[in-house]
């Protein structure tokens, strides 16, 4: 009698499953469940060879890839642990293995694991977590759907390597170690994190662990313990100790290969990896429509028992386990055509395993029998030990699924102990199709454990199952991309876009959407991409990834949240031609609604709504517009309803209340159309009457404003900040003008008739009469009325009369609705209410405002994006095919208990290359690392002109190392077969604390290999620094060379002296790079040096040619240059920039000899060199040929952005204690001139005049005489100065100018600022031309005009004076011009008096001061900082931008930058037509974007508006404005004309105001002004430009304080473009275009308000402008400069008193010579003297007026006296200046040749007197007050 099990085994799988379910329900145990087929539905894996999933694994198998490599240095030092002798203590017999990269990387945040716990977790556990998740995704089972289900986890683990690493560092052990390393925690954590309720079992049977785990999982499924199972295993090789132990058994292959079943078998090679499969009962998988990859028909396990040894295999036990599995699978051995064997390649194990295979699968060889192939994945990836079984299992599953048997590697002939001749078994050496067979394809998998546990599994081809095809392709697909954070959503979108455009290009879009929406986990954050086709989907995904707006893309922040939806129906104004056409074609619900409404519409309105929409013509006339809009709104409502979006309340705006009433059920559609038809026809009679305007005023302010206009009424309460008025057109326009003066929005609203106003009154009786019989019903949906405050409006005739006449209470209705509702959807053809809705609801941040259509965008995509935002998809894609989308992209971070390199002194990764990735295509390689000085501090010892720079030797080493690593040379070995050719440094790389570096090795189509080295700018752009070509040549040793014969003799040079000489040229070699220990110059022009790597330089085995050695060798080339030539310039230095070839023949130790040759190139363009390195054995170790040294100027050395950015910040600085009264009076004794504007036509002017009058009364005293004059009356000002100039009893002490306060109009501010600047320059000219001796101090006084706190807007007029203060500090430092901004709300004159009394104390003076209450603030120049993490949008893809001054040098640079960043349209403003050269640039830009040139002066009315209008014409949104217009006319204040001021002022200041006004209604990301460093730092000769720039700076601050986007950059001079060049060559070096672009990207992204960008020359500032020491504004810069040094020690004029006249004259001459050299840009004094005769006029050397001012200022700083500028400009020589200074110092000059100075000085005085006399003849008598 047959058993129950035997009879059950004869049933079909489905019958057995059905019987099992019945018995389970009956509570009966069913022993034959062990026969039920199990489906493999998902795979996840990571194996050597960059295998990251089943697809890449199969590709590796199909290609026959051998992934074995030398042990990576980050595991252990392979050489240090290697010994071929197995008995060697602590050594292993192999250097090889199969390794997975980045095993220290883990996405802890994704799984909610803290960094501390992640560090303690065994990397095997981490990898299992990620791979298990990937396996579930591959299966199409959302991991989050398994929570609470009977899902089991069975995993094989046996390695404890990480525990060993932990134990080695006992101090780092914490509580997490107890859950981080035990094997049970690996499975327990998966079950815990996914909420799984099935069994979680960790299996350790050594090498069979993972296949035993799969067997147990199948059993658990068959026994109904689980419904889904995750099974597999993991193995990582982190420690050398297991390999050492295995070597003692001679188990490891010395050759590092598994030669399975081959005669060359000599042991196995270890591998590592992880594999997880997802299993379900076949019947359940078919029921659930899962994709079945293969079927497990049967499995079995057993043990070897007592055999030849515990670790020795047992052929009989192996045969038995195979037989059991076949029996339980109910299949015959001959039906199996492939066996994935254990096949380790051991001498003992292979013959024993073959014996068992021959006894089972090998039988039956003969006619008609199909052969059976034997394979072992270990030949590809090594023996994965605990993960070996799952690796073989996955290989078998893929093979039966794809019907192909991959070839077995490393097999040539059978092991002599194996006789396969009588069997059907063979080893495939080539990949082949599966043998044809009558039944399904079958394979088997064996895995045998070290402990004796054996496992065998029979795998079968999956049955054909019908997968429900996707329904007809929807007109749109919704792709839901989910992630735990918005950043993860973005990265998932990027990965998916790349896949869809690459490997997944053939996958139908509907299937992609189906897989995303139905088979992926839904996380906390998700976004949706709506698309019609693949291209649109890819573009949407890329936009989502980049954070850029695009129609059809709903990002993570756009989804509606919270309960309660309100449909809001707009009034008139949303109509447009062609509205609804796309919806008619694409949306059946919309088309049906229109069709059903049309008969009623025709009956009530008189024409067809349906035909109107189909025709797409513009609807004209109020009597047609309003009914059509109501019809559209009703149809759109039905469209929303068709997707299940139902309103909880409705609101209507004006006529929109009709639609709201119909939707709420208060009116039928017939009644609603009747109401709107009657209403609109009556309104048509009044067409053209009245006007309406939108005002940026709240209701109270609007009511107050229109109180004076009785015919103007408040028509609409739009939002808390906006209202609409109605009334006669002329009165409405007057109100608009009044509001505009407040710098608030005010504009007409386009209407046919002004409703909600008495104009409507004549038609109201007829409206009530026509609707008198209307019978409204109680609404089924609440209506929130905008006509009455009533909560229950009745939609009768009276209501509709009031609806037309009463003000629209929209703001109140929305506010009321917002209490209980969170989502507001505007129902209209185009959004017209969203701004009012947002303005009303936004303050609490919990509401979502949406619209239905947008006339600028695709109607269907837009609507479905809105649907997605409320959580409804166009198509749920419930049916479709599961496709293999890319798995979740992990955001890996490194977690390790200690630095892995601590296991060996020899670090794993090359320090200048970093992490290595081999690209899957073309064999390219990429490395990434950080070479910043915090990571590589030794690199900070290589400086060029004070800046740490990556040495060319460093780039060369990177090229060598990259080529060696990529081409197979060991990490610590030289590469004599690798030659670096055509090495070139294209751009220097400045180093800061962290400097990321990317190196790429590229294989070209022409078989050439290139290495390219990049950094990345702050804007994300890659910047290439160095390139080289790589050549593989036959291995060769260096040829014999005469240099190798021994040290040469010649002239010895001290290394210390040589390095000191190099420092003079800007090259600084710190301790790590000062490697020359001996230098000998030879007679033939070459040099020989000895190089010893300093202790400060790092040791690392990966260096092929240590950068310190090569750099020292290159220094040796410099050592061949004569000293005089090296030291010839402090402004340029010879640097290596290219090499023809680099060859390294052998290892170079820490000591080497170098022979360097040098050749000068014709024309002085550079020098060529060659070096040979000879090791201690006398062998040539390396050669570098064709070294090109180029002369590099200081300004060409790049600086990090942080070293170029400045700001002016306010610092609280209490005033010093005021001395006793009488001494204080002494400091202010003398004549004072008080100037103010006598006209008081504005409140600000009156305030200033009043304050001036009060000051005069308070300030006058017996010791102080006070004169007054009108600041704008030039004659009066000059007369006042003339009056005081001749008063010896009251010498001039100070001039106080009171400047008018704020105006309500910026236009008035602009004019006042310009006039004030001009008037103050008049004061300056009067002071300079009238007063001799010590100049009176100039005080500029304003009231509340400067912005101190962020919320203070300030006034540009006052702030523009800061530019003048900065310039006068350099042109007339003795005037000590000071701007004081008083707090007019306190006691301003007390503060001012304190300032004036305190002016004489201290060595430095504050030049910009602000009082706020009793707190005193001063402005200080400081280094700026940026926060790039803010990530504000810079340039949006496809958006429009405007650039004023767009045809200038800077303008075109900005245009190119915008186009490079993806701008769609760039509008350039210019005053003239583009030149031919500019046209060429524009033509190139036109190929990538739309470039439009608008001609006109931006300062002229209408031009700015035209620029904005042009930008908007493209349809793209205007997102940014760059105001770069400028005119530069350098002129000293003394000689400035009003026309000069006007020409400079107009484009910069007036143009800025015009652009500000023109963009008032634009939603900009940024508004950027290009200002000048002159307003921040000062620049003699640029007063007009500095003041205009300061006005622009203040306008930007005013915009920010008003809540508008704005930023300004105070640019220093650019090297190739731009106009402001005054300080070039002295204090400021030029900015390169690349540096400027980097600043643009970074500063806009960081959202800074004001930033100066300039290359300030610290070493020359004090020399050129010694007066900055006396100005506290420059305190921080002076402190920096003091450390940089100046002209050397100078004892001052007192030191001259101790010298005899001849020595004093020489000292004065030498000091002035140094000053002149510095000012005129000569780097060596000898250019002036003695090479130039002492009596040669300086004007013949190229001196100009700006230089003359700086020479005078320098003389004052050095000697306390000054030569007149006129003296310098009128032919004075160095001798003449010396004579004048000697005379003023009271020193007798014995040199009669110096008397020429008298003549020149007399001539200068005569001219000054003539000018003074002419002025006197024009002056009226000034008013005099005081004692």
Curated annotation (Swiss-Prot):
Beta-ketoacyl reductase as annotated region, ranges: 1439-1617
Cofactor field: NADP(+); pantetheine 4'-phosphate
Alphabetized SMART domains for the sequence: PKS_AT, PKS_DH, PKS_KR, PKS_KS, PKS_PP
Region (N-terminal hotdog fold) residue spans: 910-1037
Reactions catalysed, as given in the entry: icosanoyl-[(phenol)carboxyphthiodiolenone synthase] + 2 (S)-methylmalonyl-CoA + 3 malonyl-CoA + 5 NADPH + 10 H(+) = C32-carboxyphthiodiolenone-[(phenol)carboxyphthiodiolenone synthase] + 5 CO2 + 5 NADP(+) + 5 CoA + 2 H2O; docosanoyl-[(phenol)carboxyphthiodiolenone synthase] + 2 (S)-methylmalonyl-CoA + 3 malonyl-CoA + 5 NADPH + 10 H(+) = C34-carboxyphthiodiolenone-[(phenol)carboxyphthiodiolenone synthase] + 5 CO2 + 5 NADP(+) + 5 CoA + 2 H2O; 17-(4-hydroxyphenyl)heptadecanoyl-[(phenol)carboxyphthiodiolenone synthase] + 2 (S)-methylmalonyl-CoA + 3 malonyl-CoA + 5 NADPH + 10 H(+) = C35-(phenol)carboxyphthiodiolenone-[(phenol)carboxyphthiodiolenone synthase] + 5 CO2 + 5 NADP(+) + 5 CoA + 2 H2O; 19-(4-hydroxyphenyl)nonadecanoyl-[(phenol)carboxyphthiodiolenone synthase] + 2 (S)-methylmalonyl-CoA + 3 malonyl-CoA + 5 NADPH + 10 H(+) = C37-(phenol)carboxyphthiodiolenone-[(phenol)carboxyphthiodiolenone synthase] + 5 CO2 + 5 NADP(+) + 5 CoA + 2 H2O
Basic residues: bias regions: 1807-1820
Domain Ketosynthase family 3 (KS3) residues, every copy: 35-461
Any GO BP: fatty acid biosynthetic process
Region ranges (Disordered): 1807-1827
Protein name from the UniProt record: Phenolphthiocerol/phthiocerol polyketide synthase subunit C
Name of the encoding gene: ppsD
Residue ranges of domain PKS/mFAS DH in the record: 910-1198
Cofactor binding mode and count: Binds 1 phosphopantetheine covalently.
Biological pathway: Lipid metabolism; fatty acid biosynthesis
Organism whose genome encodes this protein: Mycobacterium tuberculosis (strain CDC 1551 / Oshkosh)
InterPro entries from the UniProt entry: Ac_transferase_dom_sf, ACP-like_sf, Acyl_transferase_dom, Acyl_Trfase/lysoPLipase, Ketoacyl_synth_AS, Ketoacyl_synth_C, Ketoacyl_synth_N, Malonyl_transacylase_ACP-bd
Chain positions covered by the region annotation Acyltransferase: 566-876
């Amino acid at each position: 009698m047959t058993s129950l099990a035997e009879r059950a085994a004869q049933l079909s799988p489905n019958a057995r499953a059905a019987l099992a379910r019945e018995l389970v329900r009956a509570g009966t145990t069913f022993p034959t469940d062990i026969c039920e087929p199990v489906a493999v539905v998902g795979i996840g894996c990571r194996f050597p060879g960059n295998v990251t999933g089943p697809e890449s694994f199969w590709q590796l198998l199909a290609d026959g890839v051998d992934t074995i490599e030398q042990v990576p240095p980050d595991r252990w030092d392979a050489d240090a642990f290697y010994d071929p002798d197995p008995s060697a203590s602590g050594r292993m017999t192999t250097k090889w293995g199969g390794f997975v990269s980045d095993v220290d990387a883990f996405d802890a945040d994704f799984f909610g694991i803290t960094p501390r716990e992640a560090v303690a977790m065994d990397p095997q556990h981490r990898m299992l977590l990620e791979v298990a998740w990937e396996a579930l995704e591959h299966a199409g089972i959302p991991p989050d759907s398994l929570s609470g289900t009977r899902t089991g986890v069975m995993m094989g683990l046996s390695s404890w390597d990480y525990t060993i690493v932990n134990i080695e560092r006992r101090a780092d052990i914490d509580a997490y170690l107890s859950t981080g390393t035990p094997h049970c925690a690996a499975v327990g954590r998966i079950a815990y994190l996914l909420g799984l309720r099935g069994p979680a079992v960790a299996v350790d049977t050594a090498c069979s662990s993972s296949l035993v785990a799969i067997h147990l999982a199948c059993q658990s499924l068959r026994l109904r313990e689980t419904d889904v199972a995750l099974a597999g295993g993991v193995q990582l090789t982190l420690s050398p100790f297991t390999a050492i132990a295995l070597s003692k058994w001679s188990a490891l292959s010395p050759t590092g290969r598994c030669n399975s079943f081959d005669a060359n078998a000599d042991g196995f090679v270890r591998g590592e990896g992880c594999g997880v499969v997802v299993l379900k009962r076949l019947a359940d998988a078919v029921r659930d429509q899962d994709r079945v990859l293969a079927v497990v028909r049967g499995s079995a396990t057993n043990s070897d028992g007592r055999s030849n040894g515990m670790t020795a295999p047992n052929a009989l036990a192996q045969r038995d386990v195979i037989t059991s599995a076949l029996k339980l699978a109910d299949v015959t051995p001959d039906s199996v055509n492939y066996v994935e064997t254990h096949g380790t390649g051991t001498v003992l194990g292979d013959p024993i395993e073959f014996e068992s295979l021959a006894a089972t699968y090998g039988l039956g060889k003969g006619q008609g029998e199909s052969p059976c192939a034997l394979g072992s994945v270990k030949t590809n990836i090594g023996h994965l030990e605990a993960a070996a079984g799952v690796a073989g299992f996955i290989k078998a599953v893929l093979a039966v699924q794809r019907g192909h048997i991959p070839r077995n590697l490393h097999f040539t002939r059978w092991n002599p102990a194996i006789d396969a001749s009588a069997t059907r078994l063979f080893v495939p050496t080539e990949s082949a199709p599966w043998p044809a067979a009558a039944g399904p394809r079958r394979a088997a998998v064996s895995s045998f454990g070290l402990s004796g546990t054996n496992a065998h599994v029979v795998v079968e081809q999956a049955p054909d199952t019908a997968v429900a095809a996707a329904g007809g392709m929807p007109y749109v697909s919704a792709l839901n991309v989910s992630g735990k954070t918005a950043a993860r959503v973005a990265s998932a979108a990027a990965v998916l876009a790349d896949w869809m455009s690459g490997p997944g290009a053939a996958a139908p879009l509907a299937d992609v959407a189906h897989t995303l929406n139905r088979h992926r986990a839904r996380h906390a954050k998700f976004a949706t991409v709506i698309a019609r086709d693949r291209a649109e989907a890819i573009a949407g995904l890329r936009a989502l990834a980049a954070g850029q707006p695009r129609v059809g893309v709903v990002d993570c922040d756009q989804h509606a949240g919270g309960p309660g939806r309100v449909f809001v129906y707009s009034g008139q104004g949303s109509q447009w031609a062609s509205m609804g056409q796309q919806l008619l074609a694409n949306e059946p619900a919309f088309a049906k609604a229109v069709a059903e409404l049309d008969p009623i519409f025709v009956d009530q309105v008189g024409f067809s709504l349906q035909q109107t929409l189909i025709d797409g013509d513009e609807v004209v006339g109020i009597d047609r517009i309003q009914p059509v809009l109501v019809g559209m709104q009703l149809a759109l409502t039905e469209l929303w309803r068709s997707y299940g979006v139902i309103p909880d309340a409705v609101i209507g705006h004006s006529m929109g209340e009709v639609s709201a009433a119909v939707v709420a059920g208060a009116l039928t559609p017939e009644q609603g159309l009747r109401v709107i038809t009657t209403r609109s026809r009556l309104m048509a009679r009044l067409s053209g009457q009245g006007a309406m305007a939108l005002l940026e005023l709240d209701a109270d302010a609007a009511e107050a404003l229109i109180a004076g206009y009785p015919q103007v009424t408040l028509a609409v309460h739009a939002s808390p900040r906006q209202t609409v008025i109605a009334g006669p057109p002329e009165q409405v326009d007057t109100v608009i003008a009044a509001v505009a003066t407040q710098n608030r929005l005010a504009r007409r609203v386009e209407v046919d008739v002004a409703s909600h106003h008495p104009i409507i009154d004549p038609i109201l009786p007829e409206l009530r009469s026509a609707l008198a019989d209307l019978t409204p019903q109680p609404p089924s949906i609440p209506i929130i009325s905008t006509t009455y405050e009533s909560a229950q409006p009745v939609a009768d005739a009276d209501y509709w009369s009031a609806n037309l006449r009463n003000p629209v209470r929209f703001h109140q209705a929305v506010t009321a609705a917002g209490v209980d509702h969170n989502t507001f959807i505007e129902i209209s053809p185009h959004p017209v209410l969203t701004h009012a809705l947002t303005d009303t609801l936004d303050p609490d941040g919990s509401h979502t405002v949406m619209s239905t259509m947008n006339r600028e965008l695709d109607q269907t995509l837009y609507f479905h994006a809105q649907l997605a935002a409320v959580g409804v998809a166009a198509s749920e894609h419930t049916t479709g095919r599961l496709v293999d989308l890319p798995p979740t992209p992990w955001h890996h971070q490194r977690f390790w208990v200690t630095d892995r390199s601590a296991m060996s002194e020899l670090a794993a990764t090359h320090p200048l290359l970093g992490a290595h990735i081999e690209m899957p295509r073309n064999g390219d390689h990429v490395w990434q690392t950080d070479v910043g000085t915090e990571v590589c501090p030794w690199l900070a010892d290589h400086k060029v002109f004070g800046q740490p720079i990556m040495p060319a030797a460093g780039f060369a080493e990177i090229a060598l190392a990259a080529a060696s690593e990529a081409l197979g040379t060991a990490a610590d070995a030289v590469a004599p077969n690798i030659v670096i050719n055509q090495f070139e440094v294209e751009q220097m790389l400045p180093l800061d604390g962290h400097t990321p570096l990317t190196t790429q090795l590229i294989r070209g189509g022409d078989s050439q290999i290139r290495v390219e080295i990049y950094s990345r700018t702050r804007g994300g752009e890659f910047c290439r620094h160095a390139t080289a070509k790589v050549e593989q040549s036959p291995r060769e040793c260096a040829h014999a060379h005469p240099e190798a014969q021994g040290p040469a003799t010649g002239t010895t040079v001290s290394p210390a002296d040589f390095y000191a000489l190099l420092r003079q040229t800007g090259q600084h070699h710190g301790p790590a790079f000062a490697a020359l220990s001996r230098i000998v110059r030879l007679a033939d022009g070459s040099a020989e040096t000895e190089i010893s790597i300093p202790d400060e330089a790092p040791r690392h085995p990966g260096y092929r040619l240590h950068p310190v050695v090569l750099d020292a060798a290159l220094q040796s080339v410099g050592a061949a240059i004569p000293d005089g030539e090296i030291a010839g310039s402090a402004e340029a230095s010879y640097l290596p920039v290219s090499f023809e070839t680099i060859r390294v023949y052998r290892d170079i130790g820490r000591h080497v000899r170098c022979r360097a040759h040098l050749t000068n190139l014709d024309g002085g363009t550079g020098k060529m060199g060659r070096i040979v390195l000879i090791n201690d054995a006398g062998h040539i170790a390396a050669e570098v040929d064709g070294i090109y040294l180029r002369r590099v100027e200081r300004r060409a050395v790049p600086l990090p952005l942080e070293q170029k950015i400045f700001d002016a910040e306010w610092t609280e600085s209490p005033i010093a204690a005021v001395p006793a009264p009488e001494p204080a009076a002494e400091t202010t004794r003398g004549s004072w001139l008080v100037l103010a504007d006598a006209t008081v036509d504005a409140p600000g002017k009156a305030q200033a005049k009043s304050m001036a009058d009060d000051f005069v009364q308070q300030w006058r005293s017996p010791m102080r005489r006070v004169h007054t004059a009108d600041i704008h009356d030039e004659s009066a000002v000059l007369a006042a100065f003339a009056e005081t100039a001749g008063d010896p009893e009251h010498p001039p002490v100070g001039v106080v100018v009171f400047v008018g306060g704020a105006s309500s109009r910026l236009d008035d501010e602009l004019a006042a600022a310009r006039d004030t600047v001009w008037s103050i320059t008049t004061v300056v000219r009067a002071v300079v031309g009238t007063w001799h001796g010590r100049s009176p101090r100039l005080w500029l006084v304003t009231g509340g005009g400067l912005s101190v706190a962020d919320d203070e807007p300030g006034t540009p007029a006052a702030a523009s004076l800061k530019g003048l203060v900065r310039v006068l500090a350099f042109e007339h430092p003795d005037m000590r011009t000071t701007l004081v901004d008083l707090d007019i709300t306190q006691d301003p004159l007390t503060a001012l008096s304190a300032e004036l009394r305190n002016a004489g104390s201290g060595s430095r003076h504050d030049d910009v001061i602000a009082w706020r209450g009793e707190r005193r603030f001063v402005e200080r120049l400081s280094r700026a900082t940026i926060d790039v993490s803010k990530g504000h949008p810079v340039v949006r893809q496809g958006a429009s931008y405007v650039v004023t001054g767009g045809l200038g040098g800077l303008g075109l640079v900005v245009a190119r930058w915008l186009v490079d960043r993806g701008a769609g349209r760039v509008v350039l403003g210019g005053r003239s037509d583009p030149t031919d050269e500019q046209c060429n640039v524009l033509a190139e830009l036109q190929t990538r974007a739309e470039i439009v040139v608008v001609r006109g002066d931006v300062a002229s009315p209408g031009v700015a508006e035209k620029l904005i209008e042009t930008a908007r014409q493209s349809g793209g949104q205007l997102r940014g404005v760059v105001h770069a217009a400028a005119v530069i006319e350098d002129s000293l204040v003394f000689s400035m004309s009003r026309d000069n001021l006007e020409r400079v002022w107009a484009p910069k200041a007036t143009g800025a105001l015009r652009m500000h006004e023109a963009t008032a209604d634009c939603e900009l990301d940024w508004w950027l002004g290009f200002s000048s460093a002159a307003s921040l730092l000062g620049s003699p000769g640029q007063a007009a430009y500095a003041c205009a720039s300061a006005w622009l700076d203040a306008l930007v601050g005013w915009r920010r304080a008003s809540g508008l986007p704005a930023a300004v950059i105070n640019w220093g001079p650019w090297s190739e473009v731009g106009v402001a060049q005054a300080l070039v060559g002295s204090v400021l070096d030029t900015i390169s275009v690349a540096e400027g672009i980097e600043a643009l990207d970074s500063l806009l992204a960081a959202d800074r308000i004001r930033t100066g960008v300039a290359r300030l020359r610290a070493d020359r500032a004090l020399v050129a402008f010694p007066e900055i020491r006396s100005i506290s504004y420059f305190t921080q810069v002076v402190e920096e400069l003091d450390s940089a040094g100046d002209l050397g020690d100078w004892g001052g004029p007192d030191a001259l008193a101790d010298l005899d006249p001849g020595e004093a004259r020489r000292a004065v001459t030498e000091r002035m010579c140094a000053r002149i050299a510095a000012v005129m840009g000569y780097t060596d004094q000898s250019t002036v003297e003695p090479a130039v005769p002492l009596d040669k006029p300086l004007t013949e050397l190229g001196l100009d007026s700006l230089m003359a001012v700086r020479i005078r200022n320098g003389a004052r700083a050095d000697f306390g006296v000054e030569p007149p500028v006129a003296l310098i400009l009128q032919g004075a020589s160095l001798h003449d200046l010396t004579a004048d200074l000697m005379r003023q110092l009271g020193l007798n000059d014995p040199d009669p040749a110096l008397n020429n100075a008298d003549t020149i000085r007399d001539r200068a005085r005569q001219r000054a007197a003539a000018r003074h006399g002419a002025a006197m003849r024009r002056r009226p008598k000034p008013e005099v007050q005081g004692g």
